[in-house]
Amino acid sequence: MSISQLSQSFGNHLILGISGTSLNDDDKRALNELKPIGVIFFAKNFLDGVPYPVWLEKFKTLIDEVRQYSERDSIFTTLDHEGGRVVRTPLPITRFPYAYLLQSHAYEVAKATALELKSLGINVSWSPVADIFSNPQNPIIGSRAFGNTPQTASEGAREYYRGLREEGILGSAKHFPGHGDTSTDSHLELPILNLSREDLRNRELIPFQTLIQLQIPLIMTAHILFPQIDPEVPATLSKIILNDILRKELGFEGVIVSDDLDMKAVSEIFMQSGTVARAFHAGCDLFIVSRNINSSSLERTYKIAEDFSASLNNGSLDAGVVEAARERVEKLLRITPQYPVSTLDKETLVKNAELGISCCL
């Protein structure tokens, strides 16, 4: 297999960000050369301040062009869409409140959210958050979690995922093995959590266990160092955490996806040769490169793809490990609906807005 083919084969494991509301030349080149199996959208990909039909048609064109240039009819079209401040879409898509406020409404909110996501052509929501709001000083999770105990976090995440699943949206539990007790933001630096494996079993892992029992198809890693468990690398690169704990101990058989590789917690280490190989060997199947952070660049994305190619060529990356990861991803893609973009009726939007208000009363 040539270097070019190898770079394209990395696309089988890549969820890539797009630069704006339409494809620029860099986007077209990356989609055509890397052929990512999925894309992740952000607020920058939606026209704002214009009528609903206008921005929706523009977004439809964007998704159509992504498929055209990547030469993929079936792709993962993904969105961070938790509610609260983690909402990327313009109005009139409903602004549901934070997970922590949903309480008994989690199931119906997720069903309403899924209906709206399908209308946007989205098939994967990077939710529910399975972290526990256990540290009041947490700058990044906080009220994004469904509760401050293993029980309340589990119940909310379970009901939310049930709602997504029933309406045909793939969910992803995050951030494994738990980001709720940190006091730093992994977008900005590498958090360190001095928890033992037993600590995780007694608290952090419980919501993930609940979602695994419901056969959630995706679990997203946390860019966090757990020195008592694996002092060498963050969870995204840890075979102990992803293989020994997530795969073997918890029995997860689905797709393991990295959090964004552009985040400061891991951005530098992924510029080092051999890091992608280590992530695959640890257990990662899919990698998100958002191109949505100040330090992001397309050159970084290509460097990661080139490291993948070089590692396969020199034998430091086991081709069998890559093939097993590819099979897991392809198996999931085969059952992932490809939704057309469509306009929601006013009655549905008003009903969903009223539901959002009722969560806060």
Describe the predicted segments one by one.
Residues 28, 114, 157, 161, ...:
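Generic hydrophobic/aromatic pocket-lining and core-packing "Φ" positions
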Residues 10-12, 37, 71-75, 121-123, ...:
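Short, well-ordered coil/turn segments that N-cap beta-strands
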Residues 33-153, 175, 180-193, 222-234, ...:
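Enzymes and membrane/adaptor proteins characterized by extended Gly/Ser/Thr/Asp/Glu-rich
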Residues 1-37, 248, 267-361:
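Preference for extracellular/luminal or secreted protein segments
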Residues 152, 156-177, 183-186, 196-218:
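Phosphate/pyrophosphate-binding betaalpha-module
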Residues 211-231, 254:
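Oxyanion-binding "anion nests"
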Residues 2-17, 158-160, 167-170, 174-176, ...:
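Mobile, glycine- and charge-enriched loop segments
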Residues 62-77, 147-170, 203, 235-257:
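Alpha-helix-loop-beta-strand connector modules within alpha/beta enzyme cores
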